Amino acid sequence: MGQKVHPRGFRLGLSADWQAKWFNEKNYKEWLLEDEEIRKIIKNKYYHAGISEIYVERPDAERINITVKTARPGIIIGRKGSEITSLREELERKFNRRVVINIEEIKTPELDAQLVAESIASRIEKRASYKVAMKRAIMNAMRKGAQGIKVMVAGRLGGAEIARREWYLRGRLPLQKIKAIIDYGTATAWTKYGTIGIKVWIYKGDADI
C-alpha cells in the first residue's frame, strides 16, 4: 500500500517554509507547547479573519515574534490598532515575554488552500450542498490562476448512513515533483450527523531551484 507524504513537509526549505523559526534544546518542549497555544488563542479569537498561517520566531528567550497571514487584516488590527494591541498585551501577560505581532495580508484567498478548506467547511456547516461548495471553490481558484486544484471531503456526506469520501480534480497536481509549489490545507465541518473532513491541494506552478 502506498504511503502518503505531507505536501508541505516534502517541500520544506524549497517552496515551503517552517512555521516555527527557532531551536532550543533545553526549552524545546515548553516552547513547542507555547507555540501551539499561541496559534490556538489567535485562531479562536479571530476565526472569521481568514487566518491561513501563523509563524513564530524566537530571537532569544525573552522575545516572541509572531507573523499572522490573514485575508482580513482589519479585523485583527482593529480601529487605530486597538485589537492588535489588546492581543499583544494578552500574550505578554500569559507567556511573560515581549511579543511583537506582524500582519501579512493574503491578496488572493481563493489560492490559499487553508482558507479554501475553511470556506468549504463553513458552507457545509450552513447546510449548503457539499458538491456545490467544492465546485465553487475549484471554479474560483482556477479563475484566479491556479494551475491545478484537488478538493476531497470525507464523512457522512449529505447525512448518509455510511461514511464515504468524494473528490474533484481540475488541472494538474504533480505531487511527486519536489519543485512544484503545492499549497495544502485541511478543515473540519461539524454537522448534526458528525464531522466531515476537508482537504485541499492547490498547484501554483514550479519554484526556481
Swiss-Prot record:
Segments spanning the bilayer are: none
Q: Does the keyword Ribosomal protein apply?
A: yes
For molecular function, the Gene Ontology terms on record are:
mRNA binding; rRNA binding; structural constituent of ribosome
Q: Which residues form the KH type-2 domain?
A: 38-107
- Note the InterPro entries from the entry: KH_dom (IPR004087), KH_dom-like_a/b (IPR015946), KH_dom_type_2 (IPR004044), KH_sf_prok-type (IPR009019), Ribosomal_S3_C_sf (IPR036419), Ribosomal_uS3_bac-typ (IPR005704), Ribosomal_uS3_C (IPR001351), Ribosomal_uS3_CS (IPR018280)
One Gene Ontology BP term is: translation
Superkingdom per UniProt: Bacteria
A Pfam family assignment = KH_2
GO cellular component terms, alphabetically, are: cytosolic small ribosomal subunit
The UniProt keywords, alphabetically, are: Ribonucleoprotein, Ribosomal protein, RNA-binding, rRNA-binding
Q: Decide whether keyword Cell division is in the record.
A: no
Quaternary context: Part of the 30S ribosomal subunit. Forms a tight complex with proteins S10 and S14.
Purpose: Binds the lower part of the 30S subunit head. Binds mRNA in the 70S ribosome, positioning it for translation.
PANTHER family given for it? 30S/40S RIBOSOMAL PROTEIN S3 (PTHR11760), SMALL RIBOSOMAL SUBUNIT PROTEIN US3C (PTHR11760:SF19)
State the family named in the UniProt similarity comment for this chain: Belongs to the universal ribosomal protein uS3 family.
Q: What is this protein called?
A: Small ribosomal subunit protein uS3
Write down the species: Thermotoga maritima (strain ATCC 43589 / DSM 3109 / JCM 10099 / NBRC 100826 / MSB8)
Chain's gene name: rpsC
